């Protein structure tokens, strides 16, 4: 580990093999907390490469507990967190809409590390048992249409990294690696990242890991979602290649808004926002943000021919009551 750290602090890139070796040392408890902190900080300051992220993600995936839902197609839907915008849980809320529209979701996430409320926090506040066994999660995906894979249970080796990440309190490569380690091995993914500079390298890593259809998105406000506040950079995986472009809310008939309109709070506050959106009570920018992100996921999962068609399907799904019923079904299934 010392040799790898020496290379990083000089600003030199690691090979894929060196990254894999470092990750093996970290996830087996052979690296000290000081070494892990140095590794994460030096890598962040240098900037992570495609080879480094691929190597780190491959080892993390190999150590994960997995599920294999018996459904034809399913999607993972996740943000990296660490965007420091303190928005409500857009991707988590959107996941219920996507599932209710008929596209199963195998969602992987954690409690908050570098934000006010992670997916685990809001789902727990909604009444979901986030500590459900893998068999229960798998059945949830198959019967309810959505399951939540709580990172500490599905990536137990992360226990060596968690305390260091919490103490550092800054974005690290593990914000990126979490979504890439999806224990369901989803072939379709919508991943939000906190910097437009990361979309292509993350899309390339996803292709290296077997993702066939996907989008990596980052708002110009550094939101790790498709944003309503301005342009979003999109790197789309389709037909074995990555295409990068930008989209705006206006393209889809949605109104641009200030980031303040999308703010949330802790798990309890965000849970109420999620309920209000799924029940149809919330009709403002928060709802439109969910429609936009759910629409993109439905497009990626081939439930819609375009993002615009996906948005229309998402709106219809909420208005029919199906989205809030899916939330209620998940709560019941995970607590049975």
Annotate each language-model stretch with its function.
Residues 13, 83-84, 111, 120, ...:
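Gly/Ser/Thr-rich beta-alpha loop segments that engage phosphate groups in nucleotides
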Residues 7, 62-65, 87, 102, ...:
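Glycine-rich anion-binding loops and their surrounding alpha/beta cores
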Residues 79-84, 109-115, 154, 220-221:
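Acidic, glycine-rich active-site loops and adjacent beta-strand->loop/helix elements
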Residues 38, 93-97, 289, 293-296:
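Short amphipathic alpha-helical face segments that pack within enzyme cores
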Residues 1-87, 101, 105, 256-262, ...:
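Acidic, glycine/proline-rich low-complexity segments that act as flexible tails and inter-domain linkers
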Residues 33, 85-92, 113, 284-289:
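Short, conserved micro-motifs enriched in small and acidic residues
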Residues 40, 88-144:
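A glycine-rich phosphate/pyrophosphate-binding beta-strand-loop-alpha-helix module
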């Amino acid at each position: 580990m010392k040799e790898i750290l020496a290379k990083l602090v000089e600003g030199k890139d690691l090979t894929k093999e060196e990254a894999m070796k470092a990750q093996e040392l970290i996830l087996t408890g052979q690296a000290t907390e000081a070494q892990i902190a140095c590794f994460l900080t030096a890598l962040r300051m240098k900037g992570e490469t495609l080879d480094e992220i691929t190597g780190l993600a491959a080892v993390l995936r190999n150590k994960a507990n997995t599920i294999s839902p018996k459904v034809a197609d399913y999607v993972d839907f996740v943000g990296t967190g660490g965007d420091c915008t303190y928005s409500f849980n857009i991707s988590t809320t959107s996941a219920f809409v996507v599932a209710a529209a008929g596209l199963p979701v195998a969602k992987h996430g954690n409690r908050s590390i570098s934000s006010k409320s992670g997916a685990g926090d809001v789902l727990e506040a909604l009444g979901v048992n986030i500590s459900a066994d893998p068999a229960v999660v798998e059945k949830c995906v198959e019967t309810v249409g959505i399951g939540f894979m709580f990172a500490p249970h599905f990536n137990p080796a992360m226990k060596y990294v968690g305390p260091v990440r919490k103490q550092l309190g800054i974005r690290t490569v593990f914000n990126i690696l979490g979504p890439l380690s999806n224990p369901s091995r989803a072939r379709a993914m919508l991943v939000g990242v906190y910097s437009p500079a990361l979309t292509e390298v993350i899309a390339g890593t996803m292709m290296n890991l077997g993702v066939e259809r996907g989008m990596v998105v980052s708002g110009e406000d550094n939101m790790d979602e498709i944003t309503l506040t301005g342009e979003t950079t999109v790197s789309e995986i389709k037909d074995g290649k990555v295409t990068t472009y930008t989209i705006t809310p206006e393209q889809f008939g949605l109104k641009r808004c200030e980031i303040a309109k999308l703010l949330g709070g802790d798990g309890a506050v965000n849970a109420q926002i999620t309920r209000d959106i799924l029940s149809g009570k919330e009709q403002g920018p928060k709802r439109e943000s969910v429609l936009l992100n759910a629409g993109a996921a439905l497009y990626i999962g081939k439930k819609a021919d375009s993002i615009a068609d996906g948005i229309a399907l998402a709106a219809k799904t909420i208005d029919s009551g199906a989205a809030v019923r899916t939330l209620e079904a998940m709560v019941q299934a995970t607590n049975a």
